[in-house]
């Protein structure tokens, strides 16, 4: 057992606590005792397969029918990123019961040796019930420095997927052919108006928002580069404006970019309350007053540390990202990329890289647990 000191917000005194051998954070005592201990399910374990070097880059969404889909890189000859590995596949697992049980690993994208796919991300179209899975592609044998941007689509909640479509020419300029460019892993969004939006990074020219106004039939990008920004996530705010939460390396914090003009112009600020070691993170909308909930809520997950990829933490905002809670630690050890979704039972699902990428774990918890009993999800009454 390892001993630690936990500052009690309610009593303003030091309280001794214990953390179990798996470093799972436990809720402190509050006026409302919330009984839930987190269980970590390692969904992709490279140690069980001799041919796989590692699994990396998690993405998670909830399908239109409520099934949960997790996607990830299956890195075969080495654990190197796309440009340095000639055999990376995109694989998924699915759950029909809020993440209690899972399907076997299913391959979505697997090119011949020498061609690789990496960095999965997904968007769920709640109007058409289609799911779009994006990834970055390279033909390392013939065009070793050229990144292509692909998408596949599922119309049956992730059971089957279409053939890959190359959308590079739609969301990137021709002169960017040899630039280091990629679609950010994790997830994009569908706005209240129905458009699909996502983030694409060109390390030479800045981060660009791309999207579709016709449910994925065609794609476009906004030629208003955002800097500084590496891997980024986008959310729609309650007033219809857009917010991009961005990784920036060697700064020790996140940068936030907002637009009230649908991406024509952007305002940028560094958010000192969102400390970050330079790592991919996740931000999603949990509830919206417009949808009948009593509060607007945003959720943010990352490795909460200025230098090291450790301390996976979830924060909540009630004012559209202007301020954030101190956050609750999910895992204090080695933690890297993360992705979140809202399960059909209203709980929060988290899929993240754990213990130096040796595990890719899923866990879930209620809003009540996350806030130590201070907030509880109330489903809107049907009109």
Regions found by a protein language model. Give the residues of each.
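Positively charged n-region of N-terminal signal peptides that target proteins for export
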Residues: 1-4
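Sec-dependent N-terminal signal peptides
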Residues: 6-10
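C-terminal motif of bacterial Sec signal peptides marking the signal peptidase cleavage site
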Residues: 15-16
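Short, conserved catalytic or interaction motifs in soluble domains
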Residues: 19
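Asp-box/BNR beta-propeller blade signature and adjacent active/binding-site loops
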Residues: 24-383
């Amino acid at each position: 057992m390892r001993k630690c000191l936990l500052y009690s917000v309610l009593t303003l005194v030091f309280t001794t606590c214990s953390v179990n051998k798996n470093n799972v954070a436990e809720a402190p005592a509050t006026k409302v005792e919330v009984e839930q201990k987190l269980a970590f399910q390692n969904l992709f374990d490279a140690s069980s397969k001799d041919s796989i070097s590692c699994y990396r880059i998690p993405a998670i969404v909830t399908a239109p029918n409520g099934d949960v889909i997790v996607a990830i890189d299956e890195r075969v000859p080495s654990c190197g990123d796309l440009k340095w590995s000639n055999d990376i596949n995109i694989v998924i697992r699915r759950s029909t019961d809020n993440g209690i049980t899972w399907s076997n690993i299913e391959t979505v994208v697997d090119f011949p040796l020498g061609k690789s796919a990496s960095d999965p991300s997904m968007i769920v179209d709640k109007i058409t019930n289609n799911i779009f899975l994006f990834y970055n592609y390279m033909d390392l044998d013939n065009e070793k420095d050229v990144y292509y941007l692909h998408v596949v689509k599922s119309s049956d909640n992730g059971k089957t997927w279409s053939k890959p479509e190359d959308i590079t020419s739609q969301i990137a300029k021709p002169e960017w052919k040899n630039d280091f460019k990629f679609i950010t892993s994790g997830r994009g969004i569908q706005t209240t108006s129905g458009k699909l939006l996502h983030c694409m990074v060109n390390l030479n020219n800045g981060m660009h928002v791309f999207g579709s106004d016709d449910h994925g039939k065609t794609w476009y990008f906004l030629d208003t580069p955002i800097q500084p920004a590496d891997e980024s996530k986008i959310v729609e705010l309650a007033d219809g404006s857009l917010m991009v939460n961005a990784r920036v390396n060697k700064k020790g914090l996140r940068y936030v970019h907002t637009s009230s003009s649908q991406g024509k112009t952007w305002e940028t600020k560094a958010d000192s309350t969102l400390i970050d070691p330079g790592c991919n993170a996740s931000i999603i909308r949990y509830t919206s007053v417009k949808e009948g909930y009593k509060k607007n809520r945003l959720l943010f997950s990352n490795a909460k540390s200025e230098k090291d990829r450790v301390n996976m933490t979830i924060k909540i905002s009630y004012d559209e990202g202007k301020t954030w809670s101190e956050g609750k630690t999910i895992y204090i050890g080695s933690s890297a990329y993360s992705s979140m979704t809202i399960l059909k039972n209203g709980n929060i699902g988290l899929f993240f890289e754990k213990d130096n990428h040796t595990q890719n774990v899923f866990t879930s918890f209620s809003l009540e647990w996350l806030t130590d009993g201070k907030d509880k999800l109330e489903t809107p009454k049907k009109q």
